[in-house]
Amino acid sequence: MEWASGEPGRGRQGQPLPWELRLGLLLSVLAATLAQAPSLDVPGCSRGSCYPATGDLLVGRADRLTASSTCGLHSPQPYCIVSHLQDEKKCFLCDSRRPFSARDNPNSHRIQNVVTSFAPQRRTAWWQSENGVPMVTIQLDLEAEFHFTHLIMTFKTFRPAAMLVERSADFGRTWHVYRYFSYDCGADFPGIPLAPPRRWDDVVCESRYSEIEPSTEGEVIYRVLDPAIPIPDPYSSRIQNLLKITNLRVNLTRLHTLGDNLLDPRREIREKYYYALYELVIRGNCFCYGHASQCAPAPGAPAHAEGMVHGACICKHNTRGLNCEQCQDFYQDLPWHPAEDGHTHACRKCECNGHTHSCHFDMAVYLASGNVSGGVCDGCQHNTAGRHCEFCRPFFYRDPTKDMRDPAVCRPCDCDPMGSQDGGRCDSHDDPVLGLVSGQCRCKEHVVGTRCQQCRDGFFGLSASDPRGCQRCQCNSRGTVPGSSPCDSSSGTCFCKRLVTGHGCDRCLPGHWGLSHDLLGCRPCDCDVGGALDPQCDEATGQCRCRQHMIGRRCEQVQPGYFRPFLDHLTWEAEAAQGQGLEVVERLVTNRETPSWTGPGFVRLREGQEVEFLVTSLPRAMDYDLLLRWEPQVPEQWAELELMVQRPGPVSAHSPCGHVLPKDDRIQGMLHPNTRFLVFPRPVCLEPGISYKLKLKLIGTGGRAQPETSYSGLLIDSLVLQPHVLVLEMFSGGDAAALERRTTFERYRCHEEGLMPSKAPLSETCAPLLISVSALIYNGALPCQCDPQGSLSSECSPHGGQCRCKPGVVGRRCDVCATGYYGFGPAGCQACQCSPDGALSALCEGTSGQCPCRPGAFGLRCDHCQRGQWGFPNCRPCVCNGRADECDTHTGACLGCRDYTGGEHCERCIAGFHGDPRLPYGGQCRPCPCPEGPGSQRHFATSCHRDGYSQQIVCQCREGYTGLRCEACAPGHFGDPSKPGGRCQLCECSGNIDPMDPDACDPHTGQCLRCLHNTEGPHCGYCKPGFHGQAARQSCHRCTCNLLGTDPRRCPSTDLCHCDPSTGQCPCLPHVQGLNCDHCAPNFWNFTSGRGCQPCACHPSRARGPTCNEFTGQCHCHAGFGGRTCSECQELYWGDPGLQCRACDCDPRGIDKPQCHRSTGHCSCRPGVSGVRCDQCARGFSGVFPACHPCHACFGDWDRVVQDLAARTRRLEQWAQELQQTGVLGAFESSFLNMQGKLGMVQAIMSARNASAASTAKLVEATEGLRHEIGKTTERLTQLEAELTAVQDENFNANHALSGLERDGLALNLTLRQLDQHLEILKHSNFLGAYDSIRHAHSQSTEAERRANASTFAVPSPVSNSADTRRRTEVLMGAQKENFNRQHLANQQALGRLSAHAHTLSLTGINELVCGAPGDAPCATSPCGGAGCRDEDGQPRCGGLGCSGAAATADLALGRARHTQAELQRALVEGGGILSRVSETRRQAEEAQQRAQAALDKANASRGQVEQANQELRELIQNVKDFLSQEGADPDSIEMVATRVLDISIPASPEQIQRLASEIAERVRSLADVDTILAHTMGDVRRAEQLLQDAHRARSRAEGERQKAETVQAALEEAQRAQGAAQGAIWGAVVDTQNTEQTLQRVQERMAGAEKSLNSAGERARQLDALLEALKLKRAGNSLAASTAEETAGSAQSRAREAEKQLREQVGDQYQTVRALAERKAEGVLAAQARAEQLRDEARDLLQAAQDKLQRLQELEGTYEENERALEGKAAQLDGLEARMRSVLQAINLQVQIYNTCQ
């Protein structure tokens, strides 16, 4: 098979291979041949690195070469060629099932065919891939590491369009790319840099080996190291890693095709495209890291393949391994390293002194040696050790007479293993520095000897287990006898002192402690005989073993919180004893005396009486002395007593008290005069855990009594069981210590501690004995047990256990109140403080503190009168006209006047009411109609009264109200008092209006309308603009600002200056000061400039100070300096004053001022003159100086042209310089950037408008036309500019002159103003003080006059110059007027044409995109508007409803966004409202819970009050009986009693009502013997008739109130919730019969839901009990009113039922009205509840039911029917109760009528 243009021996593009490449191939073959020669030692290996020869790595490794795709491997496969040859056959067959054979199988194209061979006609064999497979891999797997240098591939077909070469150095685990090859690198391998590479390790993509030509024998060559790239270090690890390979892979990724496969996917088309490779050459050599020059066949590799590059290195430099990658065994002294040029890096042999043949390398050792040696010897022999076997092993030492390499150099140590260190180890070698001697034994610390075989002195017991060898003699120096040997050398036993024992003399003998250097060594324990359990103690601390709660080393102290009981601790108070007829005598203790008794007091024991003491809780079984404490009643009193002990049973003979006989339990004693205690003559034996009764009987008594004094027995205080301590073992022992203790106890009479309650201070002798006694008796100390409420601390006195009590508290534990105190609690006890005037005794009840009161006295301390009385101790009834129940206890002034009354006796109406409530007149207090009554929201009067003449009510209006009924707002006030809740408020006008002016403020809003005192604002709270001050103080003054120093924006004129409204500070210009802005700040000047003051800027060293003249700015210069700031030379000089000043050299004929330029010396020339000295005519002027005249008018035109050309020339020069420096780009960078920006704008407009190419072209053409026209117009305008330039110059000069005149004029005006100001000052000042001002003003005026004359009359003067300039300007303008008009006309025509052309341009497309319509219609008819269209408000109109433009869309989006924002805001508001409602609901629920809990607490507290109230009621009934049955009970009194009884509120249950009704009926029936007192009632009957008339009038008023009752029917349910429907129904029937109007009002309260509650039964009961005497003042006429009340109640009850019916129909509509009315009724309900305080328990159930109804009504109105049923049930009960009450009232009326008819 032949390929087009294919010719052997040619490279790419058919060219012959270069001779260098051919020579390289030949050398490679030669090297491969030499590699197979016998091994010879190349001299280069001894001097540095050496490398094996290079060859073809494929030779001999055909079996390691694989391809991922080969044609015909499984079956024959046809393929075709692309050729222009004349051969007819173009398609062939591939059959690679068998290897290639030129004779037998020439069509086999396996991958092994590419291995180089020198067989003839080798082009007949090649490798070929399958048809149409673009991704093919050729891979070589080597058996070891090799150096890879380059690769040559010769293709039979087209070279691949894309391929890459990869390598692996770890046998295929990881791969790295060498090079990419592609016809189109950017498409096949994006992101890969393009060739050529810049560095030797760059991975690039190369295109020169991927072109489609040549079609055959094209080559691909790759070199790992490009010769053109310098390599800095060829031996570096990176270079070695780049060359090292174990696998090489060629990935063919894309085929070259002719494009027909894209159009025709048939198999025949794909048969032309495949990969075919003639030859593959992979050059390299064996990789040995420079340690070998030859290689041998690797294990498993063919050994005799011709030309094969073997893989197993024949290593040099003491290395080993397949690639010489390791050091040989025993050559590990240096780290392995690749060989380098000039350095072999050979592995070095380990130094082990001939004691081993094995070692290893240790990097840590190598680094520690400074990179010198890292070999560590392994398995040292001959008893050696160390890194180099240079030391002897432990327990061996080096023989100094032998060499280290001698096998017998190390000898064993000869040391006693028990006494030497480390079990017999010796020094291994000599080292004078370390003090080592070879073979020397190292003894333990306490061992000596050559072989360490004996102990040191003072030590014993040589042992191998002891780390120190021997033990020190364990002898305590404090317990050892000094001067002798410490211990036995063998046993270690020490020699001890007399009181010391133990093996080491380290312990004291029993009963001793404190081992020390004393002669005896220890001290006795000396434990307390009572406080310690035994005489033993701790040897170290001496601490004895203490009994319970005893502390101290000797147990002689009491633990804090515990105490040592006194000998009289076992005390039984007589007050607590039992006995018949015993009298307890309590006694108060004064602060100044010490009580001689215990407990509250005494028990009086008379002859023959017995008192029985119950004795329990004794501490131990022993004899007790019986001690009786008493107090005589008469002088020299004596008594005979008998004490009998009653035991619970017979005494056991084996018990401690088994020796007691029955006769021993009866003891008699005699009380002698002048004694306070008795010790019975014989003790008694008692045991713990048994209860005894000790009965004390008074047999007889006598004494020296006064004749009037009788014997009253004895006062017994207490009985004390005092332990008979002398029988204790501490006193009764036979030792000397016990005898000494007893002698001391008796000598110092220590037993007398328990005789009397008062304790004397203990002596130092008795105190320890008593502590020991008490510890023995009570087995230690007793706990304080201080009562936490009555004591100040939990600790008590250690002697006796008395706790620190709070005030008023007594007892050892502070657990009871002292006599005369009560109320034991956390604060202690309170003193009784019984009133000496009202109490029978100074002692009170211990719990409540109630003192025993005298008759008439009342209260806890009996210190005030009963309720309803005053004047303690002479109590008398309160006089309150029946309007109050209590009065001041001291003055008698009534408290809590009812029915709107007030005054000391409730004799007048309170504010807001009128009438005469005094009893003789019986009037009522009625509300003042101003315009409504008090309590309403429309009551605006302080008081009112009835006019005696007109009988009209006259209102005294509150401030701010006026009118007959105070129904309007007064002047100076606003509001609408006619509306509910409306009121008049003071117009807040800061006192700046006329309070009498009705139009001063708005009567509805309160806005101030007529502000005075230069104020303004809605409240006249601000000064007017131009005024300042405090508006609230009427002190607004006009702003007085200096115009020159004030900001003109804030002060346009003197009449309207805006200063600070509070301080009057004017808004000053910069650096202007003063309240009126009238002077410069310090160091500033030029106040008259009108722009603020300028800094003086005086030179710091050349001026005398920083200040300058306020008007001229001239600083005060030192001599030789001048200028305004003194920084220049002095006048008429110039130059640098620091160097030299020169005189000005100016021609006086040409200057306009004598001073030249201070820096340059240039003279200031007058117009038309120039030159340095001003001695020449200036440019544009002609003539001979000084006569200089202006040039012709044409000079200005040409001069403008010349100046313009000069400017352009300068710009061109600048551009040329920039071109030379930065090039074209730099010179025109700004232009380019400008053009780029405009192009970007054009592109944005084009893309935004989506303009077509045609429209764009038209726009461009139109733009060019406009640009051309504008250019022409610009040229014409330039000409006009040139013509006007001269005019402008002249005009400028004229303006300059006029500006000078203007400044002069301003200065003159300023001078005039200043003179005016000075004149004003002179008017108000003295003449002498103003003289200087006048003189200064005169000088200024003279100077001003001179300057004005110079400006007007001087030649030349500014005025004459201005006139000349004006004339020249007029001539010039007249001359150019015609040309100007002609040019102007031409410009107008050009602009017209441009305007017409502009009108032809259309923006309809843009208008349609933006606004939604083309915009060609007029704005008035255009639905969407457009450019130039405006709405009625003058705003641009674009878009709208139905318009789809961008503007409409944006408006729609904006509208939706705003709507969404509004919705979100509304949602937030609603959410906040919901949150607040939830919070309010939660708060109400918590309040309801609190109210319920409070109600429950009150119910529990009232439980006990009910029984007390019942008892009081029973007592009250009995008092009523007694009062009514006694003689002298008149009808008034009887009627008052009945009325008060009826006034009692009916209790909750019908049974209680029945019981009360029965009692009232019984009381009425019991009235008798009243005929005798009829004569006393005549006057009362007449008053009763008057009251009857009042009752009739009240009834008529009640009928008028019927309408009001109907209007409040809707409030029934809500009022029932507040007070309880049932409670209101029951209580509403029991009305107060005392007053008809009050009865009617309470019936109306029943209709409205119990608006006011009745007084409680218990309260009324106490009032009735206290006012029995006052009842006689009441009137019998009230009985008639009761009948009327009965009828009214019946009609009211029927109206209530009708209201209930209407309520069910209207409750839905009137719920809000009910709620409002209920809130107004709440105050009355609360007041009623306060008055019903004593009946809480009885009303609790009804109140709870009412609260339940309230909760259900708040939740839903669905429970309304249930409430209705409950109300009907209560109404039924009410009917029954009303029937019972009518029977009672009838009985009362019958009795009253009998009395009335008997007169």
Swiss-Prot record:
The modification Phosphoserine is found at residue 1533. Residues 1349-1363 have a biased composition (Polar residues). Keywords: Basement membrane, Cell adhesion, Coiled coil, Disulfide bond, Extracellular matrix, Glycoprotein, Laminin EGF-like domain, Phosphoprotein, Repeat, Secreted, Signal. Glycans are attached at residues 251, 371, 1086, 1250, 1309, 1349, 1500. It comes from Mus musculus (Mouse). The gene is Lamb2. It is found in: Secreted, Extracellular space, Extracellular matrix, Basement membrane. This is Laminin subunit beta-2. Pfam families: EGF_laminin, EGF_LMN_ATRN, LAMB1, LAMININ_IV_B, Laminin_N. Residues 1444-1799 are annotated as: Domain I. Residues 46-285 form the Laminin N-terminal domain. GO terms for biological process: astrocyte development; axon extension involved in regeneration; axon guidance; cell adhesion; cell morphogenesis; metanephric glomerular basement membrane development; metanephric podocyte development; neuromuscular junction development. Residues 1411-1443 are annotated as: Domain alpha.
